[in-house]
Amino acid sequence: MTSFNSGRPVHVVIPARYGSTRLPGKPLVDLAGEPMIARVHARVSRALPGADIVVAIDDARIAAALDARGIRFAMTGAHHASGTDRAAELARVSGWHDTDVVLNVQGDEPLVPEALLKAFADFCVAAPDLGIATVACPVGDAALLDEPGIVKLVVDRRGRALYFSRAAIPFCRDGRSAGADLGGHLRHIGLYGYSNAALQALAHTAPCELEQLEQLEQLRALWLGMPIDVMRWPDAPPAGVDTPDDVARVVSLLKRQTQDETEPY
């Protein structure tokens, strides 16, 4: 494992669930010759060399693909409702200490920037009283404010989350004009860091009403009074993979990246 020169153990969990309504077998979807979960693991490994990286899985088919590539994995329960629950089980059975840092990197984000992963790991390790941490960037486009698939958030003066919503927050009472400054509007990026103590507390609490209404698990933490530190990032990373159309988009981007890397100068 790595402690990033802090003395605090850092673990990276990549949850990977085989079942998906929109894209069955999603972790094993072929992305330009490699299963998606292997590409995510490769990104994390390059960004955080020497880190304690574990893929938390629920299916023998994922295990076979990872084993063939020498990627460390752990089998977790098929009943988990979220990657957070899967990460919490792994941390619990592994005996990680309460103060250990646990980074949760989604297994369907094969294009997450390595610089973002490194910066976020450093951010979490540097927090002296880390409970939960996540990432936000400027919304950038006014059309996204009313898009429920884009989660918005507001923070306090210390940079801690006050609320997350699929609605446009903060609401502009006087209306939004074309070309209006969107500097006060933030969108959520789904990376999470926890102390293991906070992770276990979150996973052992039933969903709250706000979480169920918005379908946003992080609202459970706010409902419990747990602080969420928010790291600012300049822009949104490429979207993850949820549908067959997403697969085609990501494959195209990967092929373009490969071509750019191999073209002579």
Swiss-Prot record:
Catalytic activity as recorded in UniProt: 3-deoxy-alpha-D-manno-oct-2-ulosonate + CTP = CMP-3-deoxy-beta-D-manno-octulosonate + diphosphate
GO biological process, one term: CMP-keto-3-deoxy-D-manno-octulosonic acid biosynthetic process
SUPFAM superfamilies linked to this entry: Nucleotide-diphospho-sugar transferases
Keywords: Cytoplasm, Lipopolysaccharide biosynthesis, Nucleotidyltransferase, Transferase
Superkingdom per UniProt: Bacteria
Molecular function, one GO term: 3-deoxy-manno-octulosonate cytidylyltransferase activity
Task performed by this protein: Activates KDO (a required 8-carbon sugar) for incorporation into bacterial lipopolysaccharide in Gram-negative bacteria.
Family that this chain belongs to: Belongs to the KdsB family.
Name of the protein this chain belongs to: 3-deoxy-manno-octulosonate cytidylyltransferase 2
Primary gene name: kdsB2
